[in-house]
Amino acid sequence: MLFSQQQVISDTRIWLGHNREDRQLIAIEDPYTLSLDELILSKIETAAQRVLMDASWSMLAPGTPVRTRLAWRDSPGRGMAVLPLPDDFMRLLSVRLSDWQRPARIITADNPSYCWQSSPFAGVRGNPSRPVAVITSYPSGMVAELYSSMAGPSVRLVEAQYVPCPRLIDGFINLPEPLYHDVVALVAQLTMQS
């Protein structure tokens, strides 16, 4: 849901106990001092990113579909697939290939089980009954390495949803409605720490 930056600023002021009628807060005209509204505005994206990274999957679903093509390390449909992630990627919610029995367990490259994914033994690495998606960085950008498939060239991407990095665009920010008040509370906390 889209929320205007003015709405976030207003709700944060209420959270802080500072409203527009407080003349002491808006009478300061020092050019080297940030106004309360400027401080709040500078914290919105940071607070939104923190809240969305910590939120449970159910609070974020449904995500934004990943609309890129799979690349294969070896032959198509066999072994590891590479799914390039969008530039605004922040968090992967779900990914599933057509030969997998369920969505993948999502880990990052610093997870100890990442080294197991290169094992020559199918029971150790991700497989169609226990798929694993590893979020990592390539020179071309962020990718999800998908372990692994065995069905051949017919394998396709069935589902891939992600959470985009929240940004203020034209004075609006897109946030899940259930998390809005958590974002406002964190904006207020970050503003008080400034």
Question: Residue ranges of each PLM-predicted region?
Answer:
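Glycine-enriched, solvent-exposed interface loops adjoining structured elements
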Residues: 1-126, 139, 144, 149-194
